[in-house]
Amino acid sequence: MSTTVRPDEVSSILRKQLAGFESEAEVYDVGTVLQVGDGIARVYGLSKVAAGELLEFPNNVMGMALNLEEDNVGAVLFGESNLVKEGDTVKRTSILASIPVGEAMLGRVINPLGEPIDGKGTIDTQIRLPLERRAPGVIYRKSVHEPLQTGLKAIDSMIPIGRGQRELIIGDRQTGKTAVAIDTIINQKGKGVFCIYVAIGLKGSTVAQVVNTLEKYDAMEYTTVISATASDPAPLQFIAPFAGATLGEYFRDTGRHALVVYDDLSKQAVAYRQVSLLLRRPPGREAYPGDVFYLHSRLLERAAKITDDIEVARKMNDLPDALKSLVKGGGSLTALPVIETQAGDVSAYIPTNVISITDGQIFLESNLFNSGQRPAINVGISVSRVGGSAQIKAMKKVAGTLRLDLAQFRELEAFSKFGSDLDKTTKAQLDRGARLVEILKQGQYIPMPVEKQVAIIFLGTQGLLDTVDLRFIRKFEEEFLSLLEIKHNDLLAKIASSGALEADTAAKLKDIAVKFVTVFKEKNKA
């Protein structure tokens, strides 16, 4: 029996077998490490790499391409330099530096790459957003008009902050800058504001202390802490604020409110200077690179109040595809950058840069701090350029003259040191000023609801505290607010709901205060 080979049968068998064959080969664009050290790697090859693209080095070390030169790529390493050596192969990832975002991030401590560092397991998120993104254009924004209450009397009365504003907290070391930011985060409880605290170049123990404080006051449930401590590589400290802005933008663009604290941007500028000098970029003033202003301006411009018109918001520039279906209007991102000055020098390079970018500054002074005035805010040079339109009517009414009264008090106080014979009017003005200074003092981690602030500042500016002994002002405040809460809660509720201080409410408040002052003075006779 002869066997005949049929060509069509052979070709059909081959087709079937070839159809089941899958090529296992994967093509990567790779380069070679030429030189490595101080958190910087020079890589040969990678001719198609993009600026800001993530690179994969051996031993699970990630890096980012920053300098695209003619014959090599300057990359910063996000891990230990000693794990990378000359001749190692570097892979392109074709992914721009990005972090995972979502509600699952709340209550967690992460590094600037979005990896959890609190030992509570992995974070389940569906969306990744790029670290770098252009700020929303003018037509997608709305002017700041809603208040962001800090719970601090001195700030909410004289330097009000609105949702979508950038307000700088500036001062020497150990003047309470972080305390102001943490109090603001604690005060957002129940107000629908998601908070992001970015720790840049702080000690690990300081970050742990902040996390413990936020947990103690139940603030971690709506807060994410992004930490790049002093022991982390400089490139991680440089990208940390961008990670915070990206997470905040997720809440902003989905129609919610977010607050991001950058603590502090001086250390980010130092980290960026270190990276730039190692990459051989030309130095400028104080050895900072020429684009250090742009580093901070492109970061802080991302804080914005977004238009309520959802159709306009959906057309926002640079909107990542992952967010397009989730966009809602009316969201906001408020930024509180922190800057540390040296010996109160606000005219140094980085402080003046950030002052000119932000919408105002809260200046904290060591002299005031050491004299017992806390928060140690220098009202004279602190300002909020857009917050006035966000302040509630009641506060605007009672605190209208507060700044002027305090300025006059400071001036008279300086003059009164020269002579003892003061006329009645001057003495009365000094006495009232001293009481106003006293009522603006506040303990740490005890933010005050705005309606209580209105009540106590009303008493101070109306002169109802003029006869109360200065030593007992704090005690008076405590007992008076306690009385309002227990017996006259309807007054506080009315101020809180309407946001205004009606004439009848003011009259009732005055009446209660006059009676209480008499009782209090009788009880606390020296």
Curated annotation (Swiss-Prot):
Entry EC number(s) = 7.1.2.2
Q: Which GO terms describe its molecular function?
A: ADP binding; ATP binding; proton-transporting ATP synthase activity, rotational mechanism
**Subunit (UniProt):** F-type ATPases have 2 components, CF(1) - the catalytic core - and CF(0) - the membrane proton channel. CF(1) has five subunits: alpha(3), beta(3), gamma(1), delta(1), epsilon(1). CF(0) has four main subunits: a, b, b' and c.
Q: Which reaction does it catalyse?
A: ATP + H2O + 4 H(+)(in) = ADP + phosphate + 5 H(+)(out)
Protein name as annotated: ATP synthase subunit alpha
Q: How does it sit in the membrane?
A: Peripheral membrane protein
Q: Which positions in this protein are listed as binding ATP?
A: G171, D172, R173, Q174, T175, G176, K177, T178
| Taxonomy of the source species | Bacteria, Pseudomonadati, Chlorobiota, Chlorobiia, Chlorobiales
Q: Which family does the record assign? A: Belongs to the ATPase alpha/beta chains family.
Where in or outside the cell is it found?
Cell inner membrane
- Kindly give the Pfam families that the UniProt entry links to this protein: ATP-synt_ab, ATP-synt_ab_C, ATP-synt_ab_N
Instruction: Name the gene.
Output: atpA
Name the top EC class. translocase
User: What superkingdom heads the lineage?
Assistant: Bacteria
Which residues of this protein are annotated with the site description Required for activity? S382
